[in-house]
Each structure stands twice: as C-alpha cells, then as structure tokens.
C-alpha cells in the first residue's frame, strides 16, 4: 500500500520539523568549548545545563502530547519551534550557570519537547493506515537524522565565518521554520480515519493507568532509558572525547554528522524490519549492536579513521530504536493517546539522557577522561537488549486492539 498525496505532505512536514529541531539541538554540543572559554563556567556546569535540557525535553513531551491529543498538534509544534529559536539565540548572552540552564535547559529544550517525536509521530500515525505506521515513523525519524547530518557541519562552517556567537544564533533561527510547517500537522485526534481511533469512552487518565500497569510497557520504557543515556552522552561529549585524543574539532563535527547520515539508513531499515519481524526482537538486536560497537571502539587506536568508522556503525543504531518503540506503544495501547503515552516513554529516555550528559561532564572532571562512561554504555546496552525479550506484543486492551 502506498501513501496518498495528503499523507505524504503530512509525513514530509513532520520529518522536516524534526530535522530542523533535532539538527539545532545536536549542533549545540559544538559550542560547549567556546562557551566555556567565553564564560569560564567550567565543563561540569555547562554539562549540567545540557543535562537539564535532556530532562526538560522529556518532561515536556507527555504534557505537550496531552495538549496535542486534546486540541491538535499544529499550535503545539509551532510554539515549540519559536521557543527553540529563542533559547538558542540567547544562549551566548548567558554568563551564569542558572541563566544557561534557563535558556538551554528550559526554554530551548522545552520547545524541542513540544515539537518532539511524541507529538509528531501521533500526528503522522493518525494520518496513515496501521500497516504503514512503521514505514511512516521510520521516515519521520530519518528526518531527524538528516537534520543532524546537515546542520552540524553547517554550524561548524558558520563558526569559522561568523564566529561562535553568530553561528549559534544563525543555527537557532533555523527552528523558526517549524512554525509554518506545523500548519500541515494541525489535525485533531477526532479527525483520524474511521477504524483508527481508540474507543471514545476511554479517558486519557484510564489510558495512562492501564499502560503503567502493563509489564511490557514498563520493559519498553526502561529500555528507552538506556537509549537516552547513549544518545545524550555521545551527542554532548563526543567533541570532548575527540579533543582528549588530540584530534582536531572537525573530526567531532564530521563524526556527529555521519552519525546522523547513517541513522537515516538505520531508521528506514528499522521501519521496514518491524513490518516483517517482532518489534521487540528488532530492539534487542539494535541495543546489542550498540554494545558491540562501543567495545570495538574502546579496543581500537583513537585515530580519525576510528572515529569515522564508529560514527558509521553507531549511527545505524542511533535513533533506529524509535520506530519499533513507537510501533509497540501504538500496538499495545492504540492511537488515541499515542502522543501522551509515547511522551511518557520519551520522559524515561530523557531521564537517561540527563544522566548521560551530566555524568559525562562529572566523570571527565573527576578522572580527566571518559573511559568509565563507555564501560557504563556497554553494560547498559546489553541490559537493554535483554529487558526487551519478555515483552508480549499482543494488544493489551480493547481500545488498543481497535486502533491496531
């Protein structure tokens, strides 16, 4: 089955919004060193602001999802894009830890949560038939990866032309484009095609209560915590890892860009795979692959080639976990409150992200390196691979069955 023109417009708009917002967020790590030099706040304090951003991104998503589930996605996404721009553009003017936390950790990250995956995937999921949701979510997720691939090297290039303050402001302004794109995603849950909605009598509170009583939902949410730990640690501290290996900053920029590029392929592959194999099996395989990739990275000499190869391999798994995770939430608990329920899963992801970003900075200041963070990465990856195995993919409730 192919998407019709309207569905393609919705998918493309969601993918482009995610590309802009995620690209801006991922490029911010390139500015940690100049921000530290300009403010003297210290890597640990700046890492704390980035860690709070991970947490705020997660905290925002269930509430943004609840508003979108009730009133529609368009206004939520548009406001999110504006806040990302506002927080990012004002960041160079933060000269205290608390101001940095407010701008990066609250304003920009809160906006990113409002224009985040929970709201976007819900808008797309309601517009396409159930059997096509895996592919559609893979396309949207690939949009974020393309944003990372495209925006990070542009940010590095602009730094050489405009200086870091001008570059950060220019990159932040890109997120404003999410506002007009949100018009294409303005539909409300009630506008979903017949047969794709949950039973109308089920309330949001009941849907959340039922999900929190479901062991499979808890396993899935716990596994996504690990994904957040991995992604935030790498996104925030890979430039620092490169610098500690006495390699030029361009290696970090291109590594982050390649992670985004190859996650496009990973997202498409994951979206395709969940239409053919059990989603929990795809997730277990992805987490195990991450663990093996980090082990190989630790064993290899730290050269430019090593970082490039690592970026390619880890990029294939980076956000490829999103399509099967979204798919499982929708399959188990239906489409009606997907933005809210996936927002809860994303909150767990971002709690992991908070720890990955914050502990990376603390570990560096305590030991002068990141080795123990990589060891934690490996252990958590294999734990996540195992915790998905007992998940049952049978729809738990009548409303989920009706939606799936």
Name each model feature, range by range:
Residues 9-43, 61-64, 234-239:
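Extracytoplasmic
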Residues 28-32, 214-268:
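Extracytoplasmic gate region of multi-pass secondary transporters
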Residues 82-95, 289-302:
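C-terminal ends and interior cores of transmembrane alpha-helices
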Residues 99-115, 225, 306-320:
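Hydrophobic core of transmembrane alpha-helices in multi-pass small-molecule transporters
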Residues 104-142, 328, 334:
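Cytoplasmic helix-loop-helix junction between adjacent transmembrane helices
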Residues 140-190:
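Helix-loop-helix hairpin linking two adjacent transmembrane segments in secondary transporters
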């Amino acid at each position: 089955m192919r998407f019709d023109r309207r569905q393609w417009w919705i998918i493309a708009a969601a993918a482009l919004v995610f590309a802009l917002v995620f690209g801006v967020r991922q490029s911010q790590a390139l500015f940690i060193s100049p921000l530290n030099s300009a403010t003297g706040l210290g890597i640990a304090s700046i890492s704390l602001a980035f860690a709070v951003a991970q947490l705020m991104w997660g905290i925002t998503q269930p509430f943004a999802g609840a508003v979108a589930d009730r009133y529609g996605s368009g206004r939520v996404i548009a406001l999110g894009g504006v806040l990302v721009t506002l927080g990012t553009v004002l960041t160079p003017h933060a000269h205290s830890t608390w101001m940095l936390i407010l701008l990066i950790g609250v304003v920009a990250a809160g906006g990113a949560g409002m224009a985040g995956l929970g709201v976007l995937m819900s808008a797309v999921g309601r517009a396409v038939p159930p059997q096509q949701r895996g592919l559609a979510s893979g396309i949207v997720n690939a949009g974020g990866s393309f944003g990372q691939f495209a925006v990070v090297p542009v940010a590095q290039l602009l730094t050489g032309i405009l200086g870091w303050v001008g570059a950060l402001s220019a990159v932040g302004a890109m997120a404003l484009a999410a506002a007009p794109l949100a018009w294409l995603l303005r539909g409300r849950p009630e506008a979903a095609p017949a047969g794709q909605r949950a039973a109308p009598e089920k309330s949001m509170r009941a849907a959340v209560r039922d999900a929190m009583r479901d062991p499979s939902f808890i396993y899935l949410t716990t596994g996504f915590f690990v994904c957040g730990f991995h992604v935030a640690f790498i996104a925030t501290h890979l430039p620092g890892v490169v610098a500690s290996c006495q390699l030029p900053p361009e290696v970090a920029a291109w590594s982050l860009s390649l992670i985004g590029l190859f996650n496009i392929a990973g997202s498409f592959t994951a979206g395709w795979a969940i239409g053919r194999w059990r989603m929990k099996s795809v997730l277990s395989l992805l987490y195990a692959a991450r663990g093996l990739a980090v082990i190989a990275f630790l064993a290899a000499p730290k050269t430019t080639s090593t970082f490039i190869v690592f970026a390619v391999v880890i990029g294939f798994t980076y956000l490829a976990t999103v399509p099967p995770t979204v798919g499982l939430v929708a399959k188990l608990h239906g489409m009606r409150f997907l933005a809210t329920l996936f927002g809860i899963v994303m909150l767990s992801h971002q709690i992991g992200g908070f720890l990955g970003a914050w502990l990376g900075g603390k570990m560096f200041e305590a030991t002068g390196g990141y080795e123990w963070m990589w060891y934690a990465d490996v252990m958590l990856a294999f734990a996540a691979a195992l915790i998905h195995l007992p998940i049952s993919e049978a729809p738990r409730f009548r409303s989920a069955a009706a939606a799936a």
